[in-house]
Amino acid sequence: MKLMICTSNKKKFEEISSILESLKKDENLDLEFVKPPKEIEVEEYANTFLSNAYLKAKAYYNAFGIPALADDSGLVVEAFSDNLERPGVYSARFYKDSFGSHVLKEEDFKLSKDELNNLKVLRLLEKEENRKAKFVSVVAIVLSNNYGIFGEGELKGHIAKEPFGNFGFGYDPIFIPEGYNTTLANIENKDKISHRRQALEAVFFMLKKML
């Protein structure tokens, strides 16, 4: 069976396909992981990770008729979150969010999106004692018009004082997982503990029962 991995983020595609290949090998399943024939624009307007993952997977399934896997994931910082988890579903574009926008200066916008997001989190936490945070990932697989399966993963930790490490992407350089004294971006085998792996393992467990 072909399974389409729906993301335009090259690093995310590599991480997801690598995890899935290792799971497939362990179970000796007949699965082929493919990129979509072309990228399509999907408006992720929902306010939960689950809904956004489903929206993307369903849109790609409808476009190409191939079983589709999509992930929506993000960082949740306890000190920023009251009734709304932040950055949460807005993690990829947190630097644009009006929440805390005063901490970014005009000259900062020469940085990459990932660097801007990390910088904003660090500046907002400069005088904050509570640095607890967690990564959340929800994976959706749409197998037909009427059937989908879901898996969720969570990795708890806290925010570092400064970025460190060259592995990973996104908020990995500023996130220290529980039980570690370095950032996720400095852990070479981070895929073995990541929130995304947990979500993929959960959904893979359900998928293998159907094959």
Curated annotation (Swiss-Prot):
Please name the Gene3D superfamilies in this protein's record: 3.90.950.10
Where in the sequence is the active site? 72
**Principal EC category:** hydrolase
**GO CC list:** cytosol
One Pfam family of this chain: Ham1p_like
**GO function terms (MF aspect):** dITP diphosphatase activity; ITP diphosphatase activity; metal ion binding; nucleotide binding; ribonucleoside triphosphate phosphatase activity; XTP diphosphatase activity
Query: What EC number is given for this enzyme?
Result: 3.6.1.66
- The reply on keyword Hydrolase is yes
Q: Does the keyword Metal-binding apply?
A: yes
Task: Tell me where on the tree of life, at the top rank, the source sits.
Answer: Bacteria
* GO terms of biological process kind: nucleotide metabolic process; purine nucleoside triphosphate catabolic process
Record's keyword terms, sorted? Hydrolase, Magnesium, Metal-binding, Nucleotide metabolism, Nucleotide-binding
Q: Where does Mg(2+) bind?
A: 43, 72
Catalysed reaction(s) here are: XTP + H2O = XMP + diphosphate + H(+); dITP + H2O = dIMP + diphosphate + H(+); ITP + H2O = IMP + diphosphate + H(+)
What cofactor(s) does the depicted protein rely on? Mg(2+)
Q: Which SUPFAM superfamilies match?
A: ITPase-like
Cofactor info, note text? Binds 1 Mg(2+) ion per subunit.
Residue numbers binding substrate: 7-12, 73, 169-172, 190, 195-196
By sequence similarity, the record places it as follows: Belongs to the HAM1 NTPase family.
Describe the function of this protein.
Answer: Pyrophosphatase that catalyzes the hydrolysis of nucleoside triphosphates to their monophosphate derivatives, with a high preference for the non-canonical purine nucleotides XTP (xanthosine triphosphate), dITP (deoxyinosine triphosphate) and ITP. Seems to function as a house-cleaning enzyme that removes non-canonical purine nucleotides from the nucleotide pool, thus preventing their incorporation into DNA/RNA and avoiding chromosomal lesions.
Known partners and oligomeric status: Homodimer.
This chain belongs to the protein called dITP/XTP pyrophosphatase
**Where is the organism placed in the taxonomic lineage, from the top?**
Bacteria, Pseudomonadati, Aquificota, Aquificia, Aquificales
